[in-house]
Amino acid sequence: MNASNPCRRFPRSARVRTRAQYTIVFDTARRTSDPLLSLHWRTGDTPPRLGMAVSRKVDTRAVGRNRIKRVLRDAMRHLLPELAGGDYVIVARSAAAKATNPQIRDAFLRLLHRAGALPLPAAAGTMPPARTVHPSSLSPTEPEL
């Protein structure tokens, strides 16, 4: 369990926790949506923090709401090192209650990419990467690339 290994826990410092923090994000943040989730984000120089809103309208049973939050926390925990700084608040929609865990995680990743919070994945093309040549290393008769 997470309690036995504290390094695997989702740290409190990476959470949006107070009502005032949520209000700031909802009032000043940008928003993007997906059929399962809605993301409110506010970029900043602070480390990335996650907040979640999963109401009883999404799922009347606590076990269902907690499953959604657990999936989002786990995805965020793995993404923390590469995520851009700022506050991210996820609002679950009612369709999330019927979605599988991978569907929820994928929707979260799509929203983060759309918000520009994650670096774009490298294209899996067949072309080798372009060779970069500094202009000062070229001889006067050699054309630039």
Curated annotation (Swiss-Prot):
This is Ribonuclease P protein component. PANTHER family: RIBONUCLEASE P PROTEIN COMPONENT. The keyword RNA-binding applies. It catalyses: Endonucleolytic cleavage of RNA, removing 5'-extranucleotides from tRNA precursor. GO terms for cellular component: ribonuclease P complex. Residues 134-145 have a biased composition (Polar residues). RNaseP catalyzes the removal of the 5'-leader sequence from pre-tRNA to produce the mature 5'-terminus. It can also cleave other RNA substrates such as 4.5S RNA. The protein component plays an auxiliary but essential role in vivo by binding to the 5'-leader sequence and broadening the substrate specificity of the ribozyme. GO terms for molecular function: 3'-tRNA processing endoribonuclease activity; ribonuclease P activity; tRNA binding. Keywords: Endonuclease, Hydrolase, Nuclease, RNA-binding, tRNA processing. It holds the Pfam family Ribonuclease_P. Its EC number is 3.1.26.5. PROSITE patterns: RIBONUCLEASE_P. Belongs to the RnpA family. GO terms for biological process: tRNA 5'-leader removal. It comes from Xanthomonas axonopodis pv. citri (strain 306). It is an enzyme of class 3 (hydrolase). Residues 121-145 are annotated as: Disordered. Consists of a catalytic RNA component (M1 or rnpB) and a protein subunit.
